């Protein structure tokens, strides 16, 4: 029997190459304050998720029209269901123009705050971590949970 392997870090794709770039540091600090992120790893996870989406869209754009047709609609429908795009019929160029804010807006913490269930973004995080928020009747304790469009109206406060 071999030894256990160390699990691969999921945020490495979103981690910047030069982390001490002043402009990048200021931008990250502003995003962390706006969305109530606890550390940069949460931001890097969102960037990695966005990078996967953009990479997939680019690979679809590089295909011929016949190859792309059966793959494009399911991809855009998935993005629509997750709430990253506003319409499943948008062109793929629009998908390429997504930014990290589109991912951060779909986090449970942000949605709880935007719905008015919490007084601040930090209060929303505390409510979620302490188990006072349910999504479709199930308690969710992860503030980074990406809420699909169909479950957005099923978020409730548990007391």
From Swiss-Prot:
Pfam families: S4 (PF01479)
One GO location term (cellular component): small ribosomal subunit
One MF annotation (Gene Ontology) recorded for this entry: structural constituent of ribosome
Domain S4 RNA-binding: 106-158
Classification via InterPro entries: Ribosomal_uS4 (IPR022801), Ribosomal_uS4_arc (IPR022802), Ribosomal_uS4_CS (IPR018079), Ribosomal_uS4_euk/arc (IPR005710), Ribosomal_uS4_N (IPR001912), S4_RNA-bd (IPR002942), S4_RNA-bd_sf (IPR036986)
CDD domains, per the entry: S4
Highest taxon, organism lineage: Archaea
GO aspect biological process, one term: ribosomal small subunit biogenesis
UniProt entry tagged with the keyword Transcription regulation: no
Gene3D superfamilies per UniProt: RNA-binding S4 domain
Entry keywords, A to Z: Ribonucleoprotein, Ribosomal protein, RNA-binding, rRNA-binding
PROSITE patterns tied to this protein: RIBOSOMAL_S4, S4
Quaternary assembly: Part of the 30S ribosomal subunit. Contacts protein S5. The interaction surface between S4 and S5 is involved in control of translational fidelity.
Family designation: Belongs to the universal ribosomal protein uS4 family.
Functional summary from the UniProt entry: One of the primary rRNA binding proteins, it binds directly to 16S rRNA where it nucleates assembly of the body of the 30S subunit. With S5 and S12 plays an important role in translational accuracy.
Matching NCBIfam families: PRK04051.1, uS4_arch
This protein's name: Small ribosomal subunit protein uS4
